[in-house]
UniProtKB/Swiss-Prot annotation:
Cell compartment(s), UniProt: Cell membrane
Glycosylation, residue list: N84, N248, N292, N312, N368, N428, N487, N527
Signal peptide: 1-19
UniProt main location, coarse: membrane
Name by which UniProt lists this protein: Taste receptor type 1 member 2
Role: Putative taste receptor. TAS1R2/TAS1R3 recognizes diverse natural and synthetic sweeteners.
Family classification: Belongs to the G-protein coupled receptor 3 family. TAS1R subfamily.
Record text on subunit structure and interactions: Forms heterodimers with TAS1R3.
PROSITE patterns: G_PROTEIN_RECEP_F3_2, G_PROTEIN_RECEP_F3_4
Entry's transmembrane regions: 567-587, 603-623, 636-656, 682-702, 728-748, 761-781, 785-805
Phylogenetic placement of the source organism: Eukaryota, Metazoa, Chordata, Craniata, Vertebrata
Stored SUPFAM superfamilies: Periplasmic binding protein-like I (SSF53822)
Amino acid sequence: MGPRATTICSLFFLLWVLAEPAENSDFYLPGDYLLGGLFSLHANMKGIVHLNFLQVPMCKEYEVKVIGYNLMQDMRFSVEEINNDSSLLPGVLLGYEMVDVCYVSNNVQPVLYFLAHEDNLLPIQEDYSDYVSRVVAVIGPDNSESVMTVANFLSLFLLPQITYSAISDELRDKVRFPALLRTTPSADHHIEAMVQLMLHFRWNWIIVLVSSDTYGRDNGQLLGERLARRDICIAFQETLPTLQPNQNMTSEERQRLVTIVDKLQQSTARVVVVFSPDLTLYDFFNEVLRQNFTGAVWIASESWAIDPVLHNLTELRHTGTFLGITIQSVPIPGFSEFRERDSQAGPPPLGKTSQRSTCNQECDNCLNATLSFNTILRLSGERVVYSVYSAVYAVAHALHSLLGCDHSTCTKRVVYPWQLLEEIWKVNFTLLDHQIFFDPQGDMALHLEIVQWQWDRSQNPFQSVASYHPLQRQLKNIQDISWHTINNTIPVSMCSKRCQSGQKKKPVGIHVCCFECIDCLPGTFLNHTEDEYECQACPSNEWSYQSETSCFKRQLAFLEWHEAPTIAVALLAALGFLSTLAILVIFWRHFQTPMVRSAGGPMCFLMLTLLLVAYMVVPVYVGPPKVSTCLCRQALFPLCFTICISCIAVRSFQIICAFKMASRFPRAYSYWVRYQGPYVSMAFITVLKMVIVVIGMLATGLNPTTRTDPDDPKIMIVSCNPNYRNSLLFNTSLDLLLSVVGFSFANMGKELPTNYNEAKFITLSMTFYFTSSISLCTFMSAYSGVLVTIVDLLVTVLNLLAISLGYFGPKCYMILFYPERNTPAYFNSVIQGYTMTRD
């Protein structure tokens, strides 16, 4: 025996204990093809009491559920409208048989009844492909747990089942439920609409209340997972106590409600999401009213979002703003009149029996209860009824296709459940300006709406304030909401206020929504899209002020021609160049005179030429550094300057040799003269300087670099050498040594003849260079700002002037103004006088 047969046998006994109470015309209408309807006409909570007894609960023992009865009336209206339509199913009469499923175990008996034959027998067969059940399709039930129970039976027969309000995502599994479809969006869309509502109003600190049944647990878990991905935190989540059937609330359950409302009072969260059947909420909201809890935003799940009985607790208006997620409102022409006409007709007569009846087809108080809520049902826009309406029409259109109907006739024949199911999957038609079709998961893409509860009798009690489109997964058409706050301000529900621009979050506690706001320091910025908890450092060429979300390009600082210090130094350099050029011309014209020859002769022209080149290198200090300008700064100028100083040092040594060492060390002096000692020395010094320059360039490179101005971080100083201070000491070490040597030899020759006594001029030049270089290094060790470049250039020009004017200036002065002292006779007399004095 297969698993299907085993399942059927285990429940076969129930088919023989079916009661036959009085028939009510609301529940049964004969026809060529019957639709089964499962509606909750009485309110009862899931419990365990009736599961201990082998009997079906009697729904009439519980309170009437107005919405359920209203939905049942809509199915009656839909079938009647289809039967009156001469084009949809011409010549075919559609009937129905509906059952009240107020309790979880009530679903088993009706589904077996729907599957059985007219004689209440359900045969055990190996193949049900050609089996014809009592009904061709089932509409309902309303909640996910009951739908799964029914679907597990109907799926064995592939009997079409269309639910109108069950939203569980489990129902999308077509492997488990191949015959199940629904005319309402899934829980995924309901939760997404809630989350987008919270995001729109920037609520990130909420409270979640759930019922203890599967509906509450599953939706609470789904909401928690969705909120975690959107950085919305749950302050706390509580489970509402669930009453057992026909039982009063116990003291423990009462205390539980008191504790929950106390936590609501103490919490800083002001948005409360409630997933629960409506009956559980009556005692809860009464406790809320008793403790005078106000100022909340209540977000209702679809199970109670448009419940007229809860809305009838008018004092709830003082507890805050009520928003609910529900199906879109689609007015059905004529339905309100149909319901009111049916209510005015009064209850059906009792005592009428029928062998077709099953149990729980009674609702003596439904008409009176519906009549008392008729106004609110009419004003609310008949929301969920369209889901039932479209479900019935989907079956009718499938029958239209299956029976080969045209505008006048249909071919009546046996309809097998699996055939009708295939046609239902294919339906695609327009109903009241809405396209009706099922996606691959069996869902219908109807819009959801956010409704606000209103208690003004002249207004819709469930006023639409926004709409959610499942296909776009987007909240649209958000309208103004009447907030129950001072000055109608939007309620704030945040653990921590939103940080201002440029502030990072410092977590406080375990919730990501609770944090402190700390300003980002200068030089850092906050990238909200990457990390809200750490400020990122700006790139090296950018900067930011405090509390910034982006960095800006640092201003590049270098010497520019329009700046006053640059102009002043350029004028000094021009003066030095012109004066050096003039000295060169004077020396050229008086090349054969003793004054020029005593100053060094050809060596003077080498020095003057190098000085002119050094002056011409000065402009490379101005403007943005480049590889070529850096090469001139680090190689050409130091080399020129070193050769000049080496010439002075060698010239001083040569004079000392001529007057003091020639007589003492004649052999050494002869070698010095024979092998061109001055030029060999200068060549050696030049090569040594070139080695120093090459080593410096290899160590630091020629590419321009930038460094931050210590006085103003938004400025980047562009320079040729990142370690200019260290490289300056390295490059000038030889020059400083030569200046000391030149100074020493000049000091040794202070007793020489006047025309050869250059001690005071060399001392002036070398002392100035030595002092300025040491001062520059000292200045750079204490300061590294933008003034370094201009001070370096100024010292460079002054050192050049010290040689040009300090060393060559006095000689030009003697040549021009004392020509009588620039004769061989005068020089010889001076030398003879020096010799006689030494003797």
